[in-house]
């Protein structure tokens, strides 16, 4: 019990010492305290700068879009859902893809469950043909009158049924022998229009020599398709292949582009799958994408195989494949752009008198009307006000920062899928290496760009704080003293009107100079050094102990007189 009383006495003595030894300015009507500070929040956001990987700021904006909507929006881009059909099947006229004839699109969406349902085929230059058709954005077809003399046209197969009847690709004409003859074919078709024409043709590879002669008479056929600048000659490869839809033979699909003024020449003595007309080659920004995301009624400029994503951020890590005006793909999951100042959470109020501190010690929480401001303590009490001019100066330079980053990184283009056949494996490896290198480079550039912008933001906001402090110092001059923590001790009576004049820049130091000079000398003369404070502390403690002992002794004597306490002295 006595130990507790002693500790209480020591604490009270120390408090008395501080109260009388520090000479707090706001207890004196002749002085005031003015502190400058900046906005702070309890929990800031960590960002990276050039000099620091982890620096806390009051506010930051995420620059990386890391999730999609999970659905493909059909506006503003025209989306064509391929459903069960691939683009090439729709191009050739597979019976189950008739609904796509003459369709147009901005983006053709191929599904993983798409399948062919006609005679088995392959396209040696599949990726190029797919890309040309996809970028054209249409399957509009123009029939032409080719003259095929001495052969049977419109061949069909049980592998390609329309209803219950055997059929074939609607855009191709399977030519076989007529009677027991298959004459040499030599057909020309000039391009008298002012646009490029895409012709699709093919070569049939029978599974046996018997099938070859039954269809084309000759033991080996040949197909040559030429223009003035190109020529393709294909000799059928006769042989058994894995059975597909009841067929062991195959059709190889080829394509030729005929320029305006050029001529298409077709020579064959067998195995020709002839064109029925042409597709008009268009140049545009249409494309194709493999995705199983559902198509929905919504608006989005950017589409990925995962679904549409917003394009209000400069970067995304949802998918490398994109269509439309999309953020740049980077490897990082997050890149935060500082849109606020350095955050220094406000410390707990120290001391029973609630001392205030300036920006050098900490920030101020709860200052919602500005980034920079003033706090004061004077004879009229305490107050706080934001400095809107310095706040606006910082905001003007920061507000456009996000838009500038987007402008530097967004490109209005789409990244198409790259496909290569097995024989182009080395090209595919090289392409993958180039794409990976580009992504690595962009990821590094993005991180560097954001770090530079963050460094600039923090330096800028620190600079505005220092400018405001120096502006205040120049106003007060010798009428106040820099306390070293972002505060000024004003050596004259500075009421609220005086404080306001300092904030708005109309303070006249000459008016208060004499009073401030006089008060400075008086206050300095009685300021106690730390050594005197120690002596006062010990003297106060000793007196307190003495008084406590006197009170305790008096209580004991009183109790003994009343008989409440009995003392037995034993020898």
From Swiss-Prot:
Localization, UniProt: Virion membrane; Host apical cell membrane
Glycosylation sites: 29, 43, 59, 84, 186, 306, 504
Top-level division of the source organism's lineage: Viruses
Swiss-Prot/TrEMBL keywords: Clathrin- and caveolin-independent endocytosis of virus by host, Clathrin-mediated endocytosis of virus by host, Disulfide bond, Fusion of virus membrane with host endosomal membrane, Fusion of virus membrane with host membrane, Glycoprotein, Hemagglutinin, Host cell membrane, Host membrane, Host-virus interaction, Lipoprotein, Membrane, Palmitate, Signal, Transmembrane, Transmembrane helix, Viral attachment to host cell, Viral envelope protein, Viral penetration into host cytoplasm, Virion, Virus endocytosis by host, Virus entry into host cell
Post-translational modification comment from the UniProt entry: Palmitoylated. In natural infection, inactive HA is matured into HA1 and HA2 outside the cell by one or more trypsin-like, arginine-specific endoprotease secreted by the bronchial epithelial cells. One identified protease that may be involved in this process is secreted in lungs by club cells.
UniProt site positions, description: Cleavage: 350-351
Cytoplasmic-facing ranges: 557-571
Lipidated positions per record (S-palmitoyl cysteine): 560, 567, 570
Record field: transmembrane: 536-556
GO biological process: clathrin-dependent endocytosis of virus by host cell; fusion of virus membrane with host endosome membrane; fusion of virus membrane with host plasma membrane; viral budding from plasma membrane; virion attachment to host cell
Membrane topology: Single-pass type I membrane protein
A GO MF term: host cell surface receptor binding
Primary role: Binds to sialic acid-containing receptors on the cell surface, bringing about the attachment of the virus particle to the cell. This attachment induces virion internalization either through clathrin-dependent endocytosis or through clathrin- and caveolin-independent pathway. Plays a major role in the determination of host range restriction and virulence. Class I viral fusion protein. Responsible for penetration of the virus into the cell cytoplasm by mediating the fusion of the membrane of the endocytosed virus particle with the endosomal membrane.
Similarity-based family: Belongs to the influenza viruses hemagglutinin family.
The protein's name: Hemagglutinin
Species this protein is from: Influenza A virus (strain A/Equine/Jillin/1/1989 H3N8)
Lineage: Viruses, Riboviria, Orthornavirae, Negarnaviricota, Polyploviricotina
